Amino acid sequence: MSRPRILFVHGSVVNGDLTWAAQRPLAERFELVIPNRRGFPPGPDVDRVDYEDEADWLEQFVAPGTHLVGHSYGGVISLFAGVRYADQLRSLTVVEPPAFRIAAGDPVVDDYIATSERIWTERSDDPSEFLRSFLHGVGSSTPPGELSPALIQGARTLAVERYPWTAEPPLDELAATPFPKLVVSGAHNPAFDAVCDVLERRLGATRAVLPGAGHSVPRLGAPFNDLLAAFIEQNA
């Protein structure tokens, strides 16, 4: 009997191998598909990253019965992919997708959008400085010392992303799809909480909160893995 198949979609700055390193133990129970998106090591730089185009790019990795899991920018991508590949997906999990427009009007969210726009429009030409500003803003840890070449490339790719807070994922269409949804947040930032609350309500999704790793919820390892495994096995 074939194992349930999970397609993991990473977010900004680091590639799939690093984002989902703590999920490798799940390979004992599931088939794991962990692509590195364009613009991330070991691939070359890119001129532009667009979440809708990335959803199209995922087609090559989607197969019947796929459980789709997206973190951060990968979560935004996955909200679009969930509609595009609805006939092939078994479930959808998103972890803190920065789709802030869906929660616009909430003062905390509006302030976060304004702060994010400043980080991009006033960004330093030095990728290291830009990356540190970004990581501080989203609630991720900032690496000490000189950044590795991989992180420098991640910062360059980050700078050419289509702003995720402009995304308008087709939530009504996504809500109408037959597969279950899981929305996870890290209990560190009320703006991300607000987005996840909207997704829970609009999609009829299961909601989970896993504190302890800030925005980088998958780095928790076992708590996230246990949650994801139980959700997928329930819907296999």
Language model region names:
Residues M1-P44:
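Conserved HGGG/HGGXW glycine-rich cap/lid loop of the alpha/beta-hydrolase fold
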Residues E31-H67:
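Active-site loop/oxyanion-hole signature of alpha/beta-hydrolase fold enzymes
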Residues V83-T121:
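Flexible "cap/lid" loop of the alpha/beta hydrolase fold
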Residues G70-G74, S78:
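Gly/Ala-rich beta-loop-alpha elbow adjacent to hydrolase catalytic centers
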Residues L210-N225:
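Catalytic histidine-centered segment of alpha/beta-hydrolase-like enzymes
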Residues S124-A159:
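Conserved alpha/beta-hydrolase catalytic His-Asp/Glu region
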Residues E146-A213:
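Conserved serine/cysteine hydrolase catalytic core
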